[in-house]
């Protein structure tokens, strides 16, 4: 059985491990570590909204999502699922949970992903996000998406 709950500072090490494993395959493609691999998860856990999907049988976190509020807009800053747990619906469950959470306060949610993360771009389009711009930030080629909630 799985549940989604608010992340706590005690989850930091599991979240960092998931980020490292999930984004490792992009290091060579991008030429450096993707932003989620160097994110300050303790800061996110203390200052932003972090949700985890957890196996209730063994307390193992399967994935996480980080939501930040920037200029009165909600951003899905980071979402990842442990690589051996992909394609099992955990990312979709987390995304739906986040969208429901944000819909109580806002009518849209935004996100960005790296241009070279093709499967992420395709996935976001499949689940209803619309691309609205492309921009290079801190050396990362980013594709920006928005979704009406």
Write out the residue ranges for each language-model feature.
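Active-site acidic-Proline motif in GNAT/NAT acetyltransferases
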Residues: 82-84, 88, 115-116
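Conserved beta-strand-loop-alpha-helix junction that forms the acyl-donor binding cleft
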Residues: 111-121, 137-141
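Terminal substrate-recognition subdomain of acyl/acetyltransferases
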Residues: 142-149
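Acetyl-CoA-dependent GNAT
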Residues: 9-12, 16-78, 82-84, 95-97, ...
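Conserved N-terminal entry element of GNAT/NAT acetyltransferase domains
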Residues: 1-10
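Conserved GNAT acetyl-CoA-binding A-motif
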Residues: 102-113
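Conserved active-site alpha-helix within GNAT-family acetyltransferase domains
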Residues: 92, 116-133
